[in-house]
Structures are given as C-alpha cells and as structure tokens.
Amino acid sequence: MQQLILWQLINSNFPLGAYNYSEGLEYLVESAGCSEVESFQDWLGLHLRYGSIRAEVSIVLRIVQAIASGDFNQLQYWNTWLNGTRETRELRQQSIQMGNSLLKLLGDLDENKRPQLGACREQIGKSCHYAIAFGIAIALWDIESHQAVLGYLHSWLSNLVSAGVKLIPLGQTQGQRIIYQLQPLIIETVETVVTQKEMDLYACTWGLSLASMNHETQYTRLFRS
C-alpha cells in the first residue's frame, strides 16, 4: 500500500501544479543558455550536483525523522530555512503553492489523517514549502524514506524535462533519454544526501536565481511566475 501511495504522490497527474513552472528554463532557452539536448541535460545534471534540489531532499529526510521522534518544532525551523533560501519571489511562491496544495489534498484523501496534518500545520503556519509537505506525507503514511526521496527527485526531473520538451523544443524520445541517462546521478545524489549533516547543506543556484528574475520582464511566457 505504501508503495502505491508513493507512486500516487509523485505521479504527474497528482494535482499540485508542478507542470506550471519552468524554474528559470524559459529565460535560459530564450537567451540560448539551454537551447539543445546537450546543454539542457548538463543544466539538469548541475542542478542534481549543486542545486537547491539536493538540500530539499535532505530536508525531506529531516522532516520524516522529526515527526518520527515527535520533534514538531523542526517543521517550523526547516520551513523557515527553505523560505530564506528561495532567492526570488517566483521560486518561493512555487514551493509554497505546491506545499499548501499537497497538505490540503492529503487531508482530502484520508480524513483520518486530518488531526495529524492539523498539528503539523499549526507548527508551520500559513505557508508550507513543498519539501516540508512531502516529508510530512512520507512520515504519516509510513513510506520508506529512501524510496521516497528517489521518487521526489525523479518527479522533479520529469517535470523539468516535460518543460524542456515544450520550450526548446525536444522530441518525446529525446526527453525520455535525458531522464534515463540522469537516473544514475539521481541515485548518486540520494546516496550522498542521506549522510549529510546540517552544516553540510548547500546550494549554488545564482544562475537559476538570475534566470528566474528575468522571467518578470520576459515578453513571452508559457509557464507561471
């Protein structure tokens, strides 16, 4: 049952709105920073090695541990941490919109979980980042955490590849080939992150932030800001 729930959470049809966002890709395509298969795959690989998605995975695991130990104060701590590391309004709103949507949907799926979800919400406040909400789901439904974060990364990668297929544009087979070729890096990323201490968390995302900022003045957009 837990495995099926995980597949539901990371499915592209799960109504969180992830498909609405390009995470800076629209400007990078227009400026020729990511305009063909090789540069796009390199950009995704750099995200997995150095980007904020690594920190998100580590925080998902920390949320699972915090709920298991009853340390609910950690929810607010890590939610605030994520808020402070989102360098543009667009990226911050994306994470919060998806997180709030996930918490609401979890309560709609299983009314028996609403008291626990409500207790988590009290600690977090009105704005819940997606990594926090995902960690809560993994903890409350007792999903194996290693498989969960593999799914988290695979879902993130699939959504951005879908955006790249539309924007660059790429063929569907090219997009699937990118996902296939980056799967070993997903595994490597998870294996590295599970051993990280808090002081080791980092992200080098200034390029992403600059691209995201340029979305505000970009003439033509397909995705949400």
Swiss-Prot record:
The keyword Cytoplasm applies. GO terms for cellular component: cytoplasm. It is found in: Cytoplasm. UreD, UreF and UreG form a complex that acts as a GTP-hydrolysis-dependent molecular chaperone, activating the urease apoprotein by helping to assemble the nickel containing metallocenter of UreC. The UreE protein probably delivers the nickel. The keyword Cytoplasm applies. Pfam families: UreF (PF01730). Keywords: Chaperone, Cytoplasm, Nickel insertion. InterPro entries: UreF, UreF_sf. It comes from the Bacteria. One of its GO terms (molecular function) is nickel cation binding. Required for maturation of urease via the functional incorporation of the urease nickel metallocenter. This is Urease accessory protein UreF. Belongs to the UreF family.
